[in-house]
């Protein structure tokens, strides 16, 4: 009889262990949350582990890397340990509510993980250095100050700043950042961007069915009454019904509505600078963005509410104004109906404070 040598037995055990670990990586990376933690697009390679190989050797193909791993020397074992350790580190970051989102932002926007010193990355410092480099922040007495006053639609890094605000919201609330919701997102204006009344016409008539039912629900939930708002909305709705068949009178109705301080908000009252301010911008899935087009705020909010499972956390809070003090919100219940200059300012300042709180 021939017996396996100690060396061949060790090799077989190593290969069995590698196979089990390989299978674990393949299985766990099929979880969308973990996959999108360090990938921006769906897997098209067939094998999920290829994404780990590409981090370590961006220019190597899967076949080349796999061939090296099939070797039968100590280097093979060492190489595999690096692969598996990187996977374990990615998973550890992903599962950590305190730093996971910061790690995701850093990997996506600032640096790669090819350097084996990735375990020593200080994500807060990486992000602070990036913000200062791009002139989005300054540092004084060891504290970072975020500059959002001049950041708006079309500017460099506007998407990244909104992403970072969402990340910091999740870190602050100790909730897992929704990595799988970060794909196919558009930057969307909360208050309608398009003021072309021809385009706005149909959306306007369709949208204004919503306010009365919404007001009634808000008043009921808060046990409040505000007859002025209710009467104005009821009157508006009645006029809409009368004019619906005579759309050539739309312009007259539109002009009349703009004369009322409350009702004018239904059709938007932000000037061009406010519309493009970061406080009027959110990230929304492209499908939802297209579905409500130029609808007014109350209609948009209804769409958002129905699709809340697909929405980034801070976007939801923006549409439902959870950054307002509760007593202040109840005192200004009409704010529930539209998005104002004050909202733009509040959301921008809220995002600024969030980022500073988490990074300092």
Kindly give the residue locations of the regions a language model identified.
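Flexible coil/loop and intrinsically disordered segments
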Residues: 1-2, 6-360
């Amino acid at each position: 009889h021939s017996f396996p040598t100690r060396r061949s037995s060790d090799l077989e055990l190593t290969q069995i262990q590698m196979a089990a670990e390989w299978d674990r990586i393949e299985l766990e990376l099929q979880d969308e949350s973990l996959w999108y933690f360090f990938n921006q697009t769906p897997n098209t390679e067939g094998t999920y582990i290829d994404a780990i190989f590409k981090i370590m050797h961006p220019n190597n193909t899967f076949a080349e890397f796999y061939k090296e791993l099939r070797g039968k020397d100590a280097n093979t074992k060492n190489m595999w340990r690096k692969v598996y350790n990187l996977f374990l580190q990615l998973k550890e970051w992903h599962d950590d509510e305190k730093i996971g989102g910061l790690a995701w932002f850093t990997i996506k926007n600032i640096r790669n993980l090819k350097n084996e010193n990735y375990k020593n990355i200080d994500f807060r410092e990486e992000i602070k250095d990036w913000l200062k480099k791009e002139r989005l922040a300054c540092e004084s007495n060891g504290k970072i100050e975020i500059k959002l006053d001049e950041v708006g639609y079309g500017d460099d890094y506007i998407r990244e700043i909104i992403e970072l605000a969402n990340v910091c919201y999740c870190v602050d609330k100790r909730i897992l950042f929704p990595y799988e919701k970060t794909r196919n997102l558009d930057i969307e204006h909360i208050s309608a961007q398009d003021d072309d009344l021809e385009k706005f016409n149909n959306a306007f008539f369709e949208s204004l069915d919503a306010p009365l039912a919404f007001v009634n629900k808000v008043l009921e939930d808060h046990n409040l009454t505000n007859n002025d708002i209710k009467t104005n909305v009821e009157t508006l709705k009645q006029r809409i019904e009368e004019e619906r068949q005579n759309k050539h009178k739309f312009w007259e109705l539109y002009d009349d509505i703009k004369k009322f301080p409350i009702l004018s908000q239904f059709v938007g009252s932000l000037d061009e600078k406010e519309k493009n301010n970061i406080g009027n911008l959110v990230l929304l899935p492209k499908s939802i963005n297209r579905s409500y087009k130029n609808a007014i705020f109350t209609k948009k909010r209804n769409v958002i509410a129905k699709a809340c499972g697909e929405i980034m956390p801070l976007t939801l809070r923006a549409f439902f104004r959870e950054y307002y003090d509760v007593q202040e919100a109840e005192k200004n219940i009409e704010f529930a109906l539209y998005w104002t200059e004050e909202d733009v300012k509040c959301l921008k300042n809220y995002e600024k404070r969030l980022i500073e709180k988490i990074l300092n």
